[in-house]
């Protein structure tokens, strides 16, 4: 057990030095892990990411799918610069599209660590957005107009980056989907706010079934990134 520090005898500087001398310095890996757990992971939770997406780093190793994931992340990073880009990650289930999007956010948070920059980001499924915003398009439901307008302003103006998942899995409220999505994308683009769309469709099916005005926005201001490799759920990475 260490001896008590008497600041009257040693002085403040000496007391602090003696206290610090007993602290074992952390390695770079330990500091990164500490910063991730205390700063980045809580933000990912606040942004709406499920626990499985709150992990630092994509899969690594010789598996070709890991290499492809990193290539798509690099492409996503090259497109999004805080100027209203609209990008779609498309491909079969289990290829890691949401992991790519979450890693993009993680990399952004690392870049902002120990700076005054603080990006506001949200991950939502389209069913959630449509369920809340459909009142704007004729179905008032039970939500108040004041709360509705606040939520729409949050999505269109406050968020630096909005990630919308499962954009083709809206059935009951599909009549509102295209109007809501088009309005969100147009308003966010005008405000120079970036948006990432995620779909389990192939690139061809996505282009065929998506509103032409949305495809035009994608072609003009971002693009479609196809993740067309075998699902990680079918076969573990090597």
Q: Locations of the language-model features?
A:
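Short glycine-rich substrate-engagement loop in P-loop NTPases that contacts/grips substrate
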Residues: 70-73, 109-158
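Phosphate-binding P-loop
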Residues: 76-84
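A short, basic N-terminal segment
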Residues: 1-74, 224-225, 229, 233-238
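Residue-level preference for the first positions of well-ordered beta-strands
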Residues: 84-88, 121, 161, 194-196
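Active-site signature of alpha/beta-hydrolase-fold catalytic machinery across serine-
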Residues: 103, 107
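Walker A/P-loop nucleotide-binding motif
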Residues: 83-102
């Amino acid at each position: 057990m260490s001896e008590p520090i008497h600041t009257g005898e040693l002085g403040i500087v000496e007391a602090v030095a003696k206290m610090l001398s007993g602290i074992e310095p952390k390695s770079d890996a330990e500091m990164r892990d500490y910063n991730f757990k205390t700063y980045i992971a809580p933000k990912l939770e606040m942004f709406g990411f499920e626990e499985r997406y709150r992990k630092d780093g994509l899969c690594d190793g010789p598996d070709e799918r890991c290499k492809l994931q990193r290539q798509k992340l690099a492409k996503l990073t090259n497109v999004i610069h805080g100027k209203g880009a609209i990008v779609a990650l498309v491909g079969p289930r289990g290829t890691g599209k949401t992991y790519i999007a979450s890693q993009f956010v993680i990399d952004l948070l690392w870049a902002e660590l120990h700076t005054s920059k603080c990006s506001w980001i949200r991950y939502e499924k389209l069913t959630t957005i449509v369920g809340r915003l459909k009142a704007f398009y004729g179905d008032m439901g039970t939500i108040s107009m004041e709360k509705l307008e606040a939520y729409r302003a949050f999505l269109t103006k406050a968020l630096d980056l909005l990630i919308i998942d499962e954009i083709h899995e809206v059935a009951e409220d599909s009549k509102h989907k295209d109007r809501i999505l088009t309005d969100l994308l147009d308003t966010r683009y005008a405000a120079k706010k970036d948006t990432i769309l995620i779909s389990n469709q192939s690139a061809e099916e996505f282009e065929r079934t998506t509103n032409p005005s949305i495809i035009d926005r994608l072609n003009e201001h971002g693009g479609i990134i196809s993740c067309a490799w075998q699902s990680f759920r079918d076969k573990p990475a090597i």
